[in-house]
Amino acid sequence: MAVQISKKRKFVADGIFKAELNEFLTRELAEDGYSGVEVRVTPTRTEIIILATRTQNVLGEKGRRIRELTAVVQKRFGFPEGSVELYAEEVATRGLCAIAQAESLRYKLLGGLAVRRACYGVLRFIMESGAKGCEVVVSGKLRGQRAKSMKFVDGLMIHSGDPVNYYVDTAVRHVLLRQGVLGIKVKIMLPWDPTGKIGPKKPLPDHVSIVEPKDEILPTTPISEQKGGKPEPPAMPQPVPTA
């Protein structure tokens, strides 16, 4: 008999499961462009979709790595045999994914690239991908012993209101360098997309759409219109006289 739990406890349990799963996959797949996870629960099994920029690395040779990850997830979270399935899905637009760009900046800094140059490169790539705006903040011991923060901004960025929840994608990462730990924060404002592929379907509250006027058909010959009053009944056909 299945154990009955309250709705409140169910939501908390689902949230903890997703947070732990996300933390585990972030640690395991950081070098493969891991960008998030989706969990779909069906009556027969649980489907876990891993979003990444390099899906081939996630799958591994002949699907070996994805099978290993499936076994680890199954054992860690106590799923019955064959009831959990892992899939790898490629991120549609890498430039509009804050997690992917934060990881990209992290590896640039680990490679020894100058902070300003690395941040401007990420900023330019995000804006070229069609973002409405972006903000990159790097803080820590950038130069010298005193910690400071550098902010790089381009385009439009909203900071308050409900649209922030679905228009702004945020990611935070940390990178350990010789001089200490640097913090990386990337915020991307997504564009409005009526199809919902690269951005939210819902437009911003202050969005004004101008409706194009219909083309007016100009009359080529004189015509007369009867406005108001009752239309005249059609004339009755006259009888044809017979000889």
UniProtKB/Swiss-Prot annotation:
Methylation by PRMT1 is required for import into the nucleolus and for ribosome assembly. Sumoylation by SUMO1 enhances protein stability through increased resistance to proteolysis. Sumoylation occurs at one or more of the three consensus sites, Lys-18, Lys-214 and Lys-230. It is found in: Cytoplasm; Nucleus; Nucleus, Nucleolus; Mitochondrion inner membrane. The modification N6-succinyllysine is found at K132. Residues 21-92 form the KH type-2 domain. It holds the Pfam family KH_2. There is a cross-link at K202, K214 (Glycyl lysine isopeptide (Lys-Gly) (interchain with G-Cter in ubiquitin)). Keywords: Acetylation, Apoptosis, Cell cycle, Cell division, Cytoplasm, Cytoskeleton, DNA damage, DNA repair, DNA-binding, Isopeptide bond, Lyase, Membrane, Methylation, Mitochondrion, Mitochondrion inner membrane, Mitosis, Nucleus, Phosphoprotein, Ribonucleoprotein, Ribosomal protein, RNA-binding, Transcription, Transcription regulation, Translation regulation, Ubl conjugation. This is Small ribosomal subunit protein uS3.
